[in-house]
Amino acid sequence: MRSHHRHFSSYVSFILFLFLFFISFSSSTSKLEPAKSEPKRKHSVSAILVFGDSTVDPGNNNYIDTVFKCNFPPYGLDFRNKTPTGRFCNGRLVTDFIASYIGVKENVPPYLDPNLGINELISGVSFASAGSGYDPLTPTITNVIDIPTQLEYFREYKRKLEGKMGKQEMEKHIEEAMFCVSAGTNDFVINYFTIPIRRKTFTIEAYQQFVISNLKQFIQGLWKEGARKITVAGLPPIGCLPIVITLFSGEALTNRRCIDRFSTVATNYNFLLQKQLALMQVGLAHLGSKIFYLDVYNPVYEVIRDPRKFGFEEVFSGCCGSGYLEASFLCNPKSYVCPNTSAYVFFDSIHPSEKTYFSLFRSLRPIYDSILGSF
């Protein structure tokens, strides 16, 4: 039986090597509360504007030529009307909870949705694309929207608003918006650790600096376009993602647990990121700009370390299919789905469940209270 498992594990690893070309991630941590139908406006936040990867993509990939989509069941199982919106989740994302909390809208729509009216645009959209990253090579692997193009879409967005409200009012609107940036996992999990191209050029330390330099350039681009309140998420414990365990653990079927060497890469990256953001803050503070680091790693790791404390039962496999390798088209209407999504930290082999996203939002809420106080 063990021999059979070893053969199966080798076969799975081969499949996963190919499949990892089609992945991206998210963030996580306890108890879901019902959404309010009418969010109350807090302070003077005008809009929420979102950039990044599948952590914060509500469905932009629905409108581009990529296989990395999820606009079909069982995705959206716990969303309103069980709608598979294109979110890599059974329900809402962290940015949906944030938008509701700050009072601008209940859920953040994808910018590329052709049916969006001007009022939806005004209150905020997401430009994010699942599978994207800060390294220019990363989004080419799955043919998704790169970060510079997301910034170009934002410029286009500004022109649309200017046509509606005029240049001066548009600029004020952008200054009063909250910007959310969340990416980076794909750069390491898909790109550096899976494809040999970057490993031939960069040590892991040099690659971390390379990714951060690209992030810095993007943040500077946002600032030049008028962003004044920007949140930047760090990496989660990537060694705890079910698909990473399946691909890189020698005991993927018999003793599933976090792989520390991968998560250490995330902690080191997060340390460097915080230093870089602090330096940028010093340079921009006199202009009224604020950059906030969002710690994703520790809230997620706390859930994984002590899941029952947060109301979870299953940590190292996703709810969809076997939970070891399914995501995107491998998690589909024919897949097995666990009977209780709220018991699972992950919905598929990469992406957290709605409950995990809500738990993460709760852990980040004090930071958003601080941000709201700065408007």
From Swiss-Prot:
Q: Main site of residence?
A: secreted
Q: Where is the signal peptide?
A: 1-28
Domain of life from the UniProt record: Eukaryota
> Active site at which residues?
54 (nucleophile), 348, 351
Coiled-coil positions are: none
InterPro entries, alphabetically?
Answer: GDSL (IPR001087), GDSL_lipolytic_enzyme (IPR050592), SGNH_hydro_sf (IPR036514), SGNH_plant_lipase-like (IPR035669)
Molecular function as annotated in GO: hydrolase activity, acting on ester bonds
Which GO terms fall under biological process for this protein? Answer: lipid catabolic process
Q: What is its EC number?
A: 3.1.1.-
Per the record, what is one GO cellular component?
extracellular region
Subcellular localization(s) per the UniProt record: Secreted
Q: What class of enzyme is it?
A: hydrolase
Where do the record's glycosylation annotations fall on this chain?
340
A Pfam entry, by short name: Lipase_GDSL
Q: What's the family? A: Belongs to the 'GDSL' lipolytic enzyme family.
Identify this protein by name.
Answer: GDSL esterase/lipase At5g45960
